[in-house]
Amino acid sequence: MSDVRSDKPFVLAGRTFESRLLVGTGKYIDMEQTRLAIEASGAEIVTVAVRRTNLGQNPGEPNLLDVLPPDRYTILPNTAGCFDAVEAVRTCRLSRELLDGRNLVKLEVLADQKTLFPNVIETLKAAEILVKDGFDVMVYTSDDPIIARQLAEIGCIAIMPLAGLIGSGLGICNPYNLQIILEETKVPVLVDAGVGTASDATIAMELGCEAVLMNSAIAHAQQPVMMAEAMKHAVIAGRLAYLAGRMPRKLYASASSPLDGLIK
């Protein structure tokens, strides 16, 4: 019998997903590249900036849902571009109208244009309103374990701390805070922002994150479709490594083969 820990399902808002890679839809050169990259990623959940993307609110313009049909993908509307709770709540309510009453949203309330750090005070306000309004809230936040705990206590269904600045590609800047969040939070934790290449995604999964969300790392790669496939395998590898359990770190060497019984 294998001693590898068996995996548990990845569940969000009562739905089970096979892929632990979530992807965004921005920054691609056109919708065809968007479609090809997302197909290559194997992602089932696709996040969309409601304020920047036509989901049917602008008749006559290309509709992203024609390329990424909701019967194939779970569309996760997000509040990118919102800088206070009022804007974010309004955007979530618009998304519910556009997506036939679906309540799953990704909340992000930004502090400024330069850093795109989350405004945690406004995020907490918006989260409380949205949860009371019946939304299933996945929330972008800082890597502060106390804020993460408060958001979970409000009723957010997933906590999404940044690993680095949005679009920076800096990788996992503070794995220690992420570890604390993972230990202290009882809802799924997904790394959101900062991933730059496949090894970053693997590290996030090895830490124990339920999943990883990314956009720039794929869309800004020299070959986005190829990078999307790389990220697919990176997330799988990281999850398997987490379940298997890494060997302990040691200060000194340890021979792979025993020294007893050597031929003399």
From Swiss-Prot:
The annotated pathway is: Cofactor biosynthesis; thiamine diphosphate biosynthesis
Report whether Iron shows up as a keyword of the record.
no
List, from the UniProt record, the residues annotated as the active site of this protein.
Answer: K106
Q: Where are the transmembrane segments?
A: none
GO process annotations (BP): thiamine diphosphate biosynthetic process
How the protein assembles, per its UniProt entry? Homotetramer. Forms heterodimers with either ThiH or ThiS.
Q: What does this protein do?
A: Catalyzes the rearrangement of 1-deoxy-D-xylulose 5-phosphate (DXP) to produce the thiazole phosphate moiety of thiamine. Sulfur is provided by the thiocarboxylate moiety of the carrier protein ThiS. In vitro, sulfur can be provided by H(2)S.
For this entry, the protein name equals Thiazole synthase
Q: Which gene encodes it?
A: thiG
